[in-house]
Swiss-Prot record:
Protein localization: Cytoplasm
SUPFAM superfamilies referenced in this protein's UniProt entry, alphabetically: Actin-like ATPase domain
Protein's name in the database: tRNA N6-adenosine threonylcarbamoyltransferase
Pfam family, one: TsaD
Gene3D superfamilies: 3.30.420.40
Keywords carried by this UniProt record: Acyltransferase, Cytoplasm, Iron, Metal-binding, Transferase, tRNA processing
Gene Ontology MF, one: iron ion binding
Role summary: Required for the formation of a threonylcarbamoyl group on adenosine at position 37 (t(6)A37) in tRNAs that read codons beginning with adenine. Is involved in the transfer of the threonylcarbamoyl moiety of threonylcarbamoyl-AMP (TC-AMP) to the N6 group of A37, together with TsaE and TsaB. TsaD likely plays a direct catalytic role in this reaction.
Keyword Hydrolase set for record: no
Record's catalysed reaction(s): L-threonylcarbamoyladenylate + adenosine(37) in tRNA = N(6)-L-threonylcarbamoyladenosine(37) in tRNA + AMP + H(+)
Length: 342
């Protein structure tokens, strides 16, 4: 049972699963009083992707000033914090350990509850920050660099994974195709920008539907088809319209994601659809999913773009619902890089 609280609950949330060191203060699961992010994009760009060891070292440098800035922005002291929340998986183990170790130390020093939050659950709850009254049950499409999942949310305590990727995640495919197109890191936003100049119907790249009514995903074949198309064109000296390649690839990914999400939502009689994760910032995916939802009579919700990428506000929102049911973590909490959503 969810317990009603008479006073405002302030949660200090920490996120360090990949290459952003983030801290936020979230009150009552809806009011973001501070959301501070120290990004490492510029650091990793020259390597074409995140270097785990470098990411961990920068988290160690950033964690204290980021938390201090979050408290200052919120106008709060440590004594005003009711609980400390932290992402403990999935993610890069070294990066996760920095956030988890700091959060455990802080919770112990303050004598406050520690709340361990699943990173993907945080992405889902970014939607509840923007839409606290989002109708449940809902189907959430979670799309990021490392994950692609369809999740059924019956309420704030019960969820079920309906489908997952069998190989590459959608965001991973975006990044790899962007790389072969010669686009800078991070590839997803750059590919979307290039695709605006192209024809999404120019190249009939394959769509992997898998078995009939399957809610799983597969993007490795599509990724390989794009790479093979580019390699063949270069071998025969054929000029390649990179914008058409980007647009056609993006259209193929969006079509599969949208079709399977609508199938899940209608099959499980969801009252709404929630888009979440870094790829949720993609304009084509947003437009196509909203259009499909309208045709099916289902409202579609997605967070503002600043809450789609990794941040601590989403962790604070998810943690609030765990706080209500006293779902606290022991001080022995450890980082779990392959933490399952179930």
């Amino acid at each position: 049972m969810v317990k009603e609280l008479a006073t405002e609950t302030n949660i200090l949330a920490i996120e360090s699963s990949c290459d952003e060191t983030a801290a936020a203060i979230v009150s009552d699961g809806t009011r973001v009083r501070a959301n501070i992010i120290a990004s490492q994009i510029a650091v990793h760009r020259r390597f074409g992707g995140v270097v785990p060891e470098i990411a961990s070292r920068h988290h160690m440098e950033n964690i204290v000033p980021v938390v201090s800035e979050a408290l200052a922005t919120a106008g709060l002291a440590f004594s005003d914090v009711d609980a400390v929340a932290v992402t403990y998986g999935p993610g890069l183990v070294g990066a996760l350990l920095v956030g988890v170790a700091y959060a455990k130390s802080l919770a112990y020093a303050l004598g406050k509850p520690l709340i361990g939050v699943h990173h993907l659950l945080g992405h889902i709850y970014a939607g509840f920050l923007a839409y606290p009254g989002l109708p449940l049950p809902a189907v959430s499409l979670v799309v990021s660099g490392g994950h692609t999942n369809l999740v059924y949310l019956e309420d704030h305590t019960t969820r079920r994974i309906l489908g997952s990727t069998r190989d590459d995640a959608a965001g991973e495919a975006f990044d790899k195709v962007a790389r072969v197109l010669g686009l800078p890191y991070p590839g997803g936003p750059e590919l979307e920008k290039l695709a605006r100049e192209g024809n999404p119907r120019a190249i009939p790249f394959p769509r992997a539907w898998l078995e009939e009514n399957s809610l799983d995903f597969s993007f490795s074949g599509l990724k390989s088809a794009v790479i093979n198309y580019l390699h063949h064109a270069r071998q025969v000296g054929q000029e390649v319209n990179r914008a058409d390649v980007a647009a056609s690839f993006q259209a193929a990914v969006a079509e599969v994601l949208v079709t399977k999400t609508l199938l899940a939502a209608t099959s499980y009689r969801a009252r709404s659809i929630l888009l979440a994760g870094g790829v949720a910032a993609n304009s084509v995916l947003r437009r196509e999913l909203r259009s499909a939802g309208e045709q099916a009579g289902l409202p579609v919700f997605f967070p503002p773009r600043e809450l789609c990428t990794d941040n601590a506000a989403m962790i604070g929102c998810a943690a609030y619902y765990q706080y209500l049911r006293r779902d606290f973590a022991p001080l022995s909490l450890n980082a779990i890089p392959d933490l399952p959503l179930n």
